[in-house]
Each structure stands twice: as C-alpha cells, then as structure tokens.
Amino acid sequence: MCIRDRGTALEDGLVLDATIAASEAQRQALWDVRETAPESHKMSAGVARSDISLPQSALAPFYDEMVTGIRAIDPNLWICGYGHIGDGNLHFNLIADEKSNVDFDSKKKDLYELLYEKVAKYNGSISAEHGIGQTKRAQLAKVKSPEILDVMRAIKASIDPKNLMNPGKVI
C-alpha cells in the first residue's frame, strides 16, 4: 500500500489508529519491532503460531470474531497480529503468560479449530507464506473443496508421477 493509499484509508475511516514513520530512522525502528516479535514470543509461557491469509475486506470482521472466541477460551491470552496486511497475509499468534499457561497445550487444539473455522468462513488460507507442512495437512480438507484438493494432487502428479519427491507431502 503506498503512502497515498494509507492517507486515503485513514481519511475514509478504514484505519482507526496507525503509526506511520516520518523518517528513515522511524521506519527502521518500526521494522525492528516487527522483526523481533517472533523472537520475543520464545520468552513467553507458550505460543500458538499461525500464518494465514484473508481477503482484505475480511481482516476486521475476522479479527473481531477471533477476539471474542479467544476470550471465551482464555481471557488472559495475548493476541499478536502482524504481517503483510496489504496482501492479506497475517501472522496471528496467541501468547500465553503465567495466568494463561495452565493447560495451554490442551487449549491449543480449540484455539486452532477456532482459527481455521474463521479462516474458512472468510475464504482465507490456513497458510499464507510457509506452506501446509505436516502440522496443517489434516486441516486442509476442512478449508479447501474436494475439487481444489484434486487440482493440487494433479499438479503434484504432473511434476512427480512416480511420487519420488517428498512422498506424502502437499504441493
């Protein structure tokens, strides 16, 4: 999104609060905050990470519904969302502190189910930049149609008809 678009988004009321760098030093300081966020999560009592994408028009309602759902599961979780919002890519991470760390691992299943349900509702993707991997493979069938899954298999078969390259992996 260019500077003009940011100004328009602010003027049109699409953005209610923003920090826009006025200098190169401020731009770098903002970028440093974004770059150090994943490292800071390691110091928390627990984290549930995600890398999703959504249509831009769905970002605000998705976020609002997620906050409501997350608070019902654990009101003490910290929500850390950042990413390439102009592209609809969002790192939506849930961070446990000492209050929410009790059985956090058992809560992760419910948190991820909520996340994937909302991503599917808004026609998003459960993986924006980092692929499906083994951890999201079971969720793929819940958020993609059988036709899309067939196309994905056909693409893999056309590249690797003998299934020699990364057998069982998703393209």
Language-model regions, residue ranges each:
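C-terminal substrate-recognition/cap domain of FAD-linked oxidoreductases
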Residues: R4-K107, L114, K118, Y122
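General beta-strand structural signal in soluble alpha/beta enzymes
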Residues: A18, G81, A128, M165-N166
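Short proline/glycine- and acidic-rich turn/helix-capping motifs at secondary-structure junctions
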Residues: T19-D32, S127-K142
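Electropositive phosphate-/nucleotide-binding environments in soluble metabolic enzymes
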Residues: Q56, A60, K109, K142-L149
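Gly/Ser/Thr-rich beta-alpha loop segments that engage phosphate groups in nucleotides
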Residues: I85-L90, I126, G133-T135, V170
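Alpha-helix capping/hinge segments and adjacent helical runs
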Residues: A120-I132, P161-M165
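Activity-critical C-terminal alpha-helical subdomain
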Residues: R137-I171
